[in-house]
Amino acid sequence: MKRFFELLIQYKYLILALFIAISGFGYKAYINIPVDAFPDITPKQVVIYTESAGNSAEDIEKLITYPIEAAMSGLPGVKMILSNSIFGLSYVSIFFEDDYDTYLLRQLVTERLNTIDIPKGWGTPVMGPNTTGLGQVVWYALKDKENRYTPSQLRSIHEYTVVPLFKAVDGVEEVISWGGYEKQYEVLIDPLRLQNVDVSYNEILEALEKSNQSVGGQYLEFNREQYLIRGHGLYQSLDDIRNTVIRTKDAKAVTIQDVATVQEGKAPRFGAVSVDGKERVFGMVLQRSATNAAKVVKELKEKMPLVNAALPKGITLEIIYDRTQITHKAVSTMTNALLMGSVLVAIVLFLFLFELRSAFIVILSLPISLLIAFLLMQKYGISANLMSLSGLAIAIGMIVDGTIVVVENAFRLLHDNPDASRAGVIAEATAEVAKPVLFALLIIATVFIPLLSLEGLAGKLYTPMALDIVFVMLGSLAVALLLVPVLSFMLLKRSKHVNSPLMSGIKYIYTPVLKLSLKYAKTLVGITFLLFFALAYLLSQQGREFMPELNEESIMYRVIAIPGTALTQSVENAQAIEKFILKTYPKQVDSVLSMIGRSEKGETAQANYMEVLLTLNPEFKEIDSLGKKMTQQLKKKFAHLQFVPTQPIAMRIEELLEGVSAELAVKIYGEDQKVMSTIASDIAKVLKGIQGLDHAEVETQLGQAQINIKPNYLALSRYGLKVEDVMKVIRYGVGEEPITQKIEGVKRFGIVAKLKDATQDINTLKSLILRSDSGRVVTLKEVCDISVIQGPAFIKREDLSRYMVLSLEVEERDIASFVEEANTKIEKNVNIPDGYYIKWAGDFKNMQEATQTLAMIIPITLLIITLLLYTAFNSFKKAFLILLGVPLGLMGGIVALLIADIYLSVSAIVGFIAIFAIAILNGIVLVSFIDDLRQKFPTVKTIDLVKDATLLRLRPVLMTAFTTLFGILPLLFATGVGSEIQYPLSVVVTGGIISSTLLTLLVLPGLYVLFFKKT
């Protein structure tokens, strides 16, 4: 091995050139790496939505949703199918295993869609945009400064001017329009005039459809020239519609204008958008899957001037929400922690080494290792985000460990061998420590294998972190064993090393303490392990949660009214809320946006639902206290509405993973919605007295008022009417389904044949006049049974089974103990009939999955580490000795967790895994050096050798500890966006480093003496 390092030194300029090139590519990767707030946590999914205008949730479930679910359930890789059937829409989301290609899945879904038999006229299933659940990168609104345009005009301007320009931006998958009104042309039929001219409604439909068409007649040749023949019969004006002939009677044409008024109108809408008390037209940009959100937003903003120039005078675009704002805040939090950690590590290194050249070599290894990590991140498609950058921040102190060992050994041997060849001495020094350095860094990488095994949300969050730690440790290994020998040869001198004042002081205090610890080794070891078991018991009693809530520095509410609330009423509610907030908090809140109901593209919200987002004054920082105070005031002021505080990204994550808009929920499965509702209400009552439950909300799937029109077949036959005649009147005359379109350039607007006053009230609807082809006239109520009933507002399904959600808000209590107590009470007090069952969803399920996976993988990882340690030391005894150092490190982590009074979460478990790595590293450094001394001085007593070796290794052990500690401290004290997610991790690691270092220096030497006293 020595020869290998001599060759490296011989070809030193080649090695330098190689690392300069690698650093250059690494820097290029760094500046081009995609930036995002989070890793892409979206499961592989394909959404299918089917617009079925005017149809009820029950009918849509039976005729559309179920056939789609049944067809898709047999596709390869399907994990779960969620669906929601609501008035006018079927929404089916198919979740796949993550190792499938998105475009292959969309192709498979397309093939299956072609086999589904949906009844004619019930809509066409369409695949949703190829985006992620967090794909909403920009929200904006059209601002009409002079109030010159109608809501319909603004909607048309948006759809035909703004949308095409934004969709042309690379990475934009879809632009959704919301708010305003879609323009349509109305043929407003007067039933009395219709009666006078003896024309049926069916004839009007047929006339409109057949009169608006364009055909081609091939071509003719004339005078050696070819002329194309076109039959251009498309409607050009409203007069064309008015003059459309319905039928000819007594040589006189009956036209549309004889029975109807033709005018511009508004299509039925299912949602609206209000900003600061005024309705607005709103746009939502969705990024394509696997694209760079920051780049997409940047290009959208660059296109803004062009879009504003294309808009009519007086209209501008106003950005309301930009996801890169939280992205930059989150990344800035981690970047600042990384930079500050690097600076602190550099200071620590100089204070301990007290020699500029050595310190320079070690400090230089930091950026080079990080650049190698960025190069590998780019290679494997990992973005710079909150989780991946925190992995680098955790590893910042460990990066230099290998370099420290190599440089320190090289410096010592150069001083001890003044006459020997510099190249030979440095090669020998590197060869001496190469094996422990190699195995130490490999073991550190191995320690993080459990994180790579996590699945679901935990896997998507923590896998990038683990990979980044592995990448940067591989980079540091390459630097320590390839570059550092070359730099040591070029920079280190043979001058006598002067101990730093810091090290001299520490050694002065530590030496007598070490002697005492060796003298009373058995007692110290016994007390230590008793203390460990006591702390382990306390940890088992600590509350558990999946992960701390991300503070997005925003305030948002889900607002829910009673089912069946009209859209106009919801708009009034929204505007009242907006005005109240702006009046009450003029200094803190700049603007309030309300998204009511749904857009016309695959959203599933009802008219009784809205999302309210506040734009806060950038100068205002006390967001938490403001949110709590505001929530109380809103609940008091608008007692008839339900306010659920949330945040934009958090809400999308919750909905995305389980179809549940809550951190914790109970899903009730079964067939009958009334039975499920009863079970949910019973559970809510039982849970009411449990400590920590702030609010329980039963999903109100029932309660939608419906007017049922059921044909009376006997009465229809008496009047010569067909069921089809009645259904066409309901579908087109009442429901306003477009019959044809008026094309205006690239614009398309529906033409509807609407019965005048048909939807004025129920009595008017009952009195609608029907005319048979034979001329018989009758009202709707004479041939149909018309009743008002309560039906489902929506029907949710999971894997072909209906379910209902009971959402729970738990405050000031951990999720795990709450669920444990709740389960006990439910089993004792709630009667769940046969065919019905419940499941917990949300954070508890994620936490369960993560802990079960870790419980299985960590023992396997321990076995791998044991084998690596055995390979390094050729002794199971020494491997076991080093592994005994792990509990010593865990003790400090447990104490820190208990003192900070935070729950045991996946983030905290990651901290314990990091301590595992640090403890093993300390053990390897110390044990390998003791072994070296025992080989050189076989006749010296073990206890004396251990004492000398520990004192000699004091500096590298302390440097390892302090660099890791100071590397993690900025993460511990960070206060920006995302810091709360890594806080448990940094608390645990900080405590673990302190205990691991103290106990490695006090207990491990004694353990070594006890293990090898007789050898």
Set out the residue ranges of the language-model regions.
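Signature of alpha-helical transmembrane segments and their immediate interfacial
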Residues: M1-V35, V433, N499-P548, K637, ...
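C-terminal transmembrane helical bundles of large multi-pass transporters
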Residues: R323, F360, L389, Q633-K1014
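Pore- and gate-forming transmembrane helices of large, multi-pass membrane proteins
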Residues: L7-L8, I326-A346, A359-I368, M398, ...
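Cytosolic juxtamembrane regions of multi-pass inner-membrane proteins
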Residues: L306-A310, T327-N336, F352-F354, I382-F439, ...
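Transmembrane alpha-helices and their membrane-interface boundaries in multi-pass membrane transporters
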Residues: N385, I396-A410, V433-S453, K460-V498, ...
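Transmembrane helices with small-residue packing motifs
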Residues: Y13, I20-S56, N114-G123, T248, ...
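Membrane-proximal extracytoplasmic
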Residues: M1-S342, A384, K460, T631, ...
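Interfacial segments of transmembrane alpha-helices in multi-pass membrane proteins
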Residues: K2-K12, S289-N292, H328-N385, I449, ...
